[in-house]
């Protein structure tokens, strides 16, 4: 630290700080072997964070996080062999925080509207998220690498007041199997040279609707 003209760290002060943190989470920490023994016939909730395309190995490298975010990391991270069915959760539009390829990104007032209406700001940094149209290509890829069997769509109401909705259905007409999702340069090129979109009419207000049957036909489409 002296080499970089930085102040020396107060070791005792930092140890005391870390110990205070430890005391707060102490009762939440357990050895995995205890879980195997005591919870073998019970349901366990595993919590992860960040989207599939930020996965260290399968995301749009190098614009990824420092760990695996796909569902199979449950077994890797916990050491437990888990038999599970994956439900994929996605928004009715696409978002991204920070740099990285985003073929369906919006740079106009619609993108700003989605960010404001959907409260798309970083949880910690409060940084505004980049917003774009729903990208079926990346969604399909995310389903494949997570072995998704069912899908749950969220934030549909954010798009209620728009006149038209676009959905990205392909990248420059390429077949899905020909796309390399780890090649950020290629994905950026798709954004610069145009992705392929399909236009849909909006569905209007869906406030108070409590069943699938009650949803507007445009939304079902």
Label the predicted regions.
Residues 1-221:
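Non-transmembrane, aqueous-exposed alpha-helical and coiled segments at domain scale
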């Amino acid at each position: 630290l002296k080499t970089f003209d930085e102040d020396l760290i107060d070791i005792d002060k930092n140890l005391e700080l870390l110990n205070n943190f430890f005391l707060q989470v102490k009762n939440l920490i357990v050895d995995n072997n205890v879980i195997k023994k005591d919870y073998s016939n019970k349901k366990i909730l595993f919590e992860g964070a960040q989207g599939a395309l930020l996965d260290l190995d399968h995301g749009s490298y190098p614009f990824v996080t420092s760990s695996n975010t796909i569902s199979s990391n449950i077994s890797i991270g916990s050491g437990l062999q888990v038999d599970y069915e994956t439900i994929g959760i996605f928004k009715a539009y696409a978002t991204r925080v920070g740099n990285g390829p985003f073929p369906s990104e919006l740079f106009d007032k619609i993108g700003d509207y989605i960010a404001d209406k959907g409260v798309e700001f970083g949880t910690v940094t409060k940084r505004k998220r980049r917003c774009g149209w729903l990208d079926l290509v990346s969604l399909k890829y995310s389903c494949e690498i997570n072995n998704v069997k069912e899908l749950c769509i969220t934030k549909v109401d954010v798009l209620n007041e728009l006149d038209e909705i676009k959905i990205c259905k392909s990248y420059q007409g390429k077949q899905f199997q020909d796309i390399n999702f780890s090649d950020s340069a290629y994905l950026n090129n798709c954004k610069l040279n145009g992705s392929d979109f399909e236009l849909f009419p909006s569905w209007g207000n869906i406030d108070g609707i409590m069943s699938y049957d009650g949803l507007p036909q445009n939304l079902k489409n």
